[in-house]
């Protein structure tokens, strides 16, 4: 009887040990799978332009935390892609001094800072570009986005006014959009004193700034203010509230912008659910785009916002607006302004500057 009991107990122990070993093995496999790069993300990584990858690798080395996991005040302290560009330039032995322009001058538009860039060449009166930086209405400022205004001032032969705006969540929608429109009206009113031509004022923006540049064009039409002569929209935010487009699905885990970050930005900026249906915020929900200024729309392949940027370009075309649309493969959100280290960024900057020059010459 004892022998049988001992044998039974030993058998039970052996079965339990095998089960535990199997569970541990399964747990290890699950852990390994969780830490591995998702197949879709790995596929997007394989499409990266080598120069773009170098910037993203450098950004990763700066040790920033995920923006979407942080309070806004902490998110604003994280390294930006512009920091990665400067770090990479240092490693390459390149000068990190800003691209020279004719001159710069810091101003105030209401209570918001602004920086005015004059071109090195050309003669008065210059055309003007009112530029709005990116950052999801939450992070970044005119200092972070210094490279683009310099490139455009130089290459388009225009005065560029980089206009700051109030940030969320301290200031909810439509605060930033109202500030953007106020900056545009300030440019019209002060163009002559800056040495510019008030009849040749364009708007331009990147990401959230591209969204606001599009909205400013709508607001000018609605309020019967002189409309911009042109709008340059670089990977504009198309809407808040929906994150299920083809490019959102394909680039949900992309860097430096992913789906979770866009949800975070919109959550911080939107004050009430119905804001998400406002065409000034969700430009792809606009019902009437007829009569808006001609546009250049730039998108990039590895970017959650690519589909919406293309959608808005198509909507403008369908409304009879003259549109120049170009998508850049192998690069990511924020590539524009990286012309010192990414050739495709240099090409995109030249494309926008050329289109602006053409608009100003008419």
Map each language-model feature to its residues.
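Bacterial N-terminal signal peptides that target proteins for export
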Residues: 1-9
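Alpha/beta-hydrolase superfamily serine-hydrolase fold, recognizing
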Residues: 25-32, 36-82, 89-362
């Amino acid at each position: 009887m004892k022998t049988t009991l001992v044998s039974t107990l030993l058998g039970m122990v052996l079965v339990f040990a095998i089960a535990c070993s199997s569970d541990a093995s399964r747990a290890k496999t699950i852990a390994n799978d969780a830490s591995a790069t998702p197949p879709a993300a790995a596929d997007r990584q394989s499409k990266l332009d080598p120069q773009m990858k170098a910037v993203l690798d450098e950004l990763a080395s700066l040790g920033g935390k995920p923006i979407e996991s942080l309070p806004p005040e902490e998110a604003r302290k994280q390294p930006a892609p512009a920091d990665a560009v400067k770090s990479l330039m240092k490693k390459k032995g390149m000068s990190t001094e800003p691209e020279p322009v004719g001159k710069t001058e810091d101003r105030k538009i209401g209570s918001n800072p602004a920086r005015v860039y004059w071109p090195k060449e050309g003669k008065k009166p210059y055309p003007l570009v009112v530029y709005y930086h990116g950052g999801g209405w939450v992070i970044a400022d005119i200092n972070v986005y210094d490279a683009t205004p310099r490139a455009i001032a130089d290459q388009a032969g225009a005065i560029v006014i980089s206009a700051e705006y109030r940030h969320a969540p301290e200031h909810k929608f439509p605060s930033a959009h109202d500030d953007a429109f106020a900056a545009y009206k300030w440019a019209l009113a002060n163009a002559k004193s800056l040495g510019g031509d008030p009849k040749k004022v364009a708007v331009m923006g990147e990401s959230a700034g591209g969204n606001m540049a599009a909205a400013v064009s709508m607001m000018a039409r609605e309020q019967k203010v002189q409309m911009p002569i042109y709008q340059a929209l670089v990977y504009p935010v198309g809407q808040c509230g929906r994150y299920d487009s083809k490019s959102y699905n394909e680039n949900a885990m992309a860097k430096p912008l992913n789906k979770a970050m866009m949800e975070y930005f919109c959550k911080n900026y939107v004050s009430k659910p119905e804001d998400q249906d406002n065409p000034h915020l969700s430009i792809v929900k606009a019902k009437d785009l007829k009569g808006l200024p001609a546009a250049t729309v730039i998108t990039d392949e590895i970017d959650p916002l690519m589909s919406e940027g293309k959608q808005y370009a198509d909507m403008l075309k369908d409304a009879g607006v003259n549109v120049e649309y170009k998508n850049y493969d192998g690069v990511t959100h924020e590539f524009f302004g990286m012309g010192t280290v990414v050739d495709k960024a240099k090409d995109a900057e030249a494309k926008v500057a050329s289109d602006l020059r053409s608009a100003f010459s008419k």
